[in-house]
A protein has these predicted regions:
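Gly/Pro-rich turn-and-neighbor structural signature
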Residues: 1-41, 152-169
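Short alpha-helix boundary/capping segments
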Residues: 4-7, 11, 46, 82-89, ...
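Residues on a specific face of well-ordered alpha-helices
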Residues: 14-17, 52, 64, 95, ...
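Glycine-rich, charged/polar anion/phosphate-binding loops
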Residues: 36-37, 50, 82-84
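Short, Lys/Arg- and Gly-enriched loop/turn segments at beta-strand edges
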Residues: 41-47, 75-76
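A short, hydrophobic, proline-anchored segment that marks a local hinge/packing element in signaling
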Residues: 49-57, 67
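Gly/Pro-rich active-site capping loops and adjacent beta-alpha segments
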Residues: 61-120
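N-terminal leader/propeptide and maturation segments of large enzyme subunits in energy/redox metabolism
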Residues: 96-169
Length: 169
C-alpha cells in the first residue's frame, strides 16, 4: 500500500455512517452516493468518496456497503489542484459534496452532478475529468459488489459477515 492509504481508509467508516444516517429507509438497489465533506469523514475536498449499498437478492435488505475513495486532480477552489495554503473557509478549497445521490436506481444523475461540480464561487475547473473519475469509482464499487456476491455465494453470508467482524476487531 501507498504511505497515504491509512489517511484514506481511516475515516472512510465515518463517511459510510453519514450516508447510512442520512438515508436510512430511502436507499434503493442501484443507488450510489458521493461525498467529500471533511465534517462527515472526508479528509480534504479533493479526496472524494463513492458509496454503494449492497442489497440482498430481494432488494429489501442492505447486506454491505462498498466504498472507494480517490483523489481528484481538481475539485475547484481558489487555486488549481484544490489545496490552497491560504484558504480561510472550506469553500475556498473547492466544491463541498455532502451525501449527494450520484446514481439513482442504476441511472447516473449526470446533469445534476455536473450542476453540483459547476456550482459555487470556486467550481471545478475540469468537470469532464471529475465525471470520468466518478464513473471509474462507480465501476470500482460495482466490481466490489460483484466480488462480495461471489464470496457470499461460495462461503455463505454468515461466514462472510463473521470474517468481516474479525477483520474489524
Amino acid at each position: 500500500n501507498a504511505p497515504h492509504m491509512p489517511v484514506h481508509l481511516g475515516s472512510m467508516g465515518e463517511s459510510i455512517r453519514t450516508v447510512i444516517r442520512e438515508n436510512t429507509g430511502r436507499m434503493r438497489p442501484g443507488d450510489v452516493y458521493v461525498l467529500n465533506a471533511p465534517y462527515n469523514g472526508g479528509t480534504h475536498l479533493p479526496d472524494v468518496t463513492v458509496i454503494t449499498p449492497v442489497f440482498d437478492d430481494t432488494g429489501k435488505s442492505i447486506l454491505f456497503y462498498v466504498g472507494s475513495r480517490g483523489h481528484h486532480a481538481d475539485i475547484g477552489g481558489i487555486t488549481p489542484g484544490s489545496m490552497p495554503p491560504d484558504s480561510r473557509v472550506v469553500e475556498e478549497e473547492g466544491v463541498l459534496i455532502d451525501n449527494f445521490l450520484l446514481v439513482e436506481q442504476g441511472r447516473l444523475r449526470e446533469q445534476e452532478t455536473i450542476a453540483l461540480l459547476s456550482s459555487g464561487k470556486y467550481p471545478c475547473r475540469n468537470v469532464a475529468q471529475n465525471m470520468a473519475d466518478l464513473r471509474a469509482m462507480i465501476a470500482a464499487n460495482e466490481k466490489g459488489v460483484q466480488e462480495l456476491r461471489r464470496m457470499v455465494a461460495h462461503f455463505g453470508l454468515d461466514v462472510v459477515h463473521a470474517y468481516m467482524r474479525h477483520v474489524q476487531d
